[in-house]
Regions:
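Bacterial N-terminal signal peptides
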Residues: 2-13
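Sec/Tat signal peptide C-region and signal peptidase I cleavage site
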Residues: 14-18
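Active-site rim/loop-helix segments in enzyme catalytic domains that contact anionic ligands
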Residues: 19-117
Length: 117
């Protein structure tokens, strides 16, 4: 009886995440490669999505992109957002790109002080 109760409590606390066969297969292929890649750039628009995708999906390396800023000091030719609002847009763009290319996204706390040319 106690075992059944403990098992019931344990199973209610464990989060079961359903994965497709393709996702499981891709995760298994990553076990055959030991290594990681960190792509580092100053601004969100300096990323190389093709390279990140190659390392994440073909080489099966643990791959991440570190953007030193969130792009809040950049220019915006297609909208009115500047400053922090532009940084929010650029941040969401990078997070969406990582969902597609399979990399992880990281940011530093550096502040983008604007266009310098």
């Amino acid at each position: 009886m106690r075992v059944a109760i403990l098992l019931g409590i344990f199973l209610s606390l464990v989060e079961v995440k359903a994965q497709s066969a393709v996702k499981i297969y891709e995760d298994l292929k990553k076990l055959n490669f030991l290594g990681s890649v960190l792509y580092l750039a100053a601004h969100p628009d300096d990323e190389n999505t093709a390279l990140i995708s190659y390392f994440a999906n073909q080489v099966h390396a643990e791959t991440a992109y570190l953007s030193l800023t969130r792009g809040d000091g950049g220019q915006n030719r297609i909208g009115n957002e500047l400053g922090e609002l532009l940084g929010v847009i650029r941040t969401n763009e990078l997070l969406a790109a990582r969902k597609i290319d399979g990399g992880q996204q990281f940011f530093s706390s550096a502040i983008d002080f604007g266009y310098s040319k």
